[in-house]
Regions:
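Conserved beta/loop motifs at nucleotide-recognition and modification sites
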Residues: 1-268
Length: 268
């Protein structure tokens, strides 16, 4: 099941039983958890919602076995799975959970495919994949979010914005909110405002810096480099980015030494 199907299930009030939430897109995953939380009336969440962090099997089953109070259902959010859990036992338990309980197992990143509980949920179509969003979805999300807050953002400008910030939705959300706050209700987000207010991804900033040097704009290139190095997190990001590039160069060199042409190496 993809994240869109899961959101539709929430909107249709169709959540029943246990679900596994996994994948690299943590922002969308968190949004799904917030949407599911709204299934429980706010006044009764203290009674009918439990949030657990790497619980043992007894704590997890106890939370699921607790009957709802002043309502007809209970939401249990399990953040992470502790090592050493009796997974076969839990895999069997989710088959006989009370119908009043909804269990959401929230895994950061990818879940262990060898885990018997994960296998069971996948086999039953209860594993929700939160993969990196395609650019088209990011553009639509940006336009919709801006519109909800009274700002105007067209698709071409949204594409420029996404190209600058990258595909991490947490960064997208933070930077977009800055733009919305800058233009205010009824304002229009333009490329000029984006260029003045948005912090681009490390990859984008590095390539922009290199473009300055290759175009002979040494002063602009040095200014961009110093700007990056002044930010400790950016400096670490540059190191990580360059490391990944060097690894690709080394892999390409090995392939060429093995007899592959440069064109074949680019496609590999």
């Amino acid at each position: 099941m993809n994240h869109n199907d899961f959101f539709k299930l929430i909107a249709a009030d169709g959540l029943r039983g246990a679900y596994l939430l996994q994948g690299e897109e943590e922002f969308v995953k968190a949004s799904a958890l917030k949407a599911a939380e709204k299934l429980i009336p706010e006044d009764f969440r203290a009674f009918n919602m439990s949030v657990l962090y790497e619980p043992d099997a007894d704590a997890l089953t106890e939370a699921c076995e607790t009957l709802p109070l002043f309502g007809d259902r209970r939401l249990v959010v399990c953040n992470g799975l502790a090592s050493g859990l009796d997974y076969p036992r839990l895999a069997d338990y989710i088959q006989k959970m009370p119908e009043s309980s909804i269990l959401l197992i929230n895994i950061k990143g990818a879940a262990d495919s060898k885990n018997s509980l994960v296998k069971r949920l996948r086999s039953e179509g209860r594993a929700v994949e939160f993969d990196e969003l395609p650019l088209s979805d990011i553009i639509k999300w940006c336009m919709k979010t801006a519109n909800k807050q009274g700002a105007v953002l067209d698709s071409d400008t949204a594409r420029t914005f996404a190209g600058l910030v990258g595909t991490d939705m947490t960064a997208i959300s933070n930077e977009l909110q800055k733009l919305i706050d800058t233009v205010g209700p009824g304002g229009t987000i333009t490329r000029d405002i984006i260029s003045r207010c948005t912090v681009g991804s490390i990859e984008f900033q590095v390539f922009a810096m290199i473009d300055c040097f290759t175009a002979g704009k040494v002063r602009d290139g040095m200014r961009a480099l110093h700007g990056l190095l002044e930010d400790r997190d950016a400096a670490l990001g540059i190191a990580s980015f360059l490391e990944s590039r060097f690894k690709l160069m080394l892999e390409g060199r090995k392939l060429m030494d093995g007899g592959l042409s440069a064109d074949c190496c680019r496609k590999a």
